[in-house]
Amino acid sequence: MFMTYQPKKRQRKKEHGFRKRMSTQSGRNILRKRRQKGRKKLTA
């Protein structure tokens, strides 16, 4: 048995990063909602 979460900075940014969010309409919606809510961190 080993830990299933093997964090990688590059992979995380590629999947959940700002540019990835901006690239799709639904991603932009996510950012808009998070801005409305007042999140300090919008993306990973």
Swiss-Prot record:
Transmembrane segments: none annotated. GO terms for biological process: translation. Residues 7-22, 30-44 have a biased composition (Basic residues). NCBIfam families: rpmH_bact. HAMAP family: Ribosomal_bL34. This is Large ribosomal subunit protein bL34. It comes from the Bacteria. InterPro entries: Ribosomal_bL34, Ribosomal_bL34_CS. Signal peptide: none annotated. Pfam families: Ribosomal_L34 (PF00468). Keywords: Ribonucleoprotein, Ribosomal protein. Belongs to the bacterial ribosomal protein bL34 family. One of its GO terms (cellular component) is ribosome. The keyword Nucleotide-binding does not apply. The lineage of its organism: Bacteria, Bacillati, Bacillota, Clostridia, Eubacteriales. It comes from Clostridium botulinum (strain Eklund 17B / Type B). GO terms for molecular function: structural constituent of ribosome. Residues 1-44 are annotated as: Disordered.
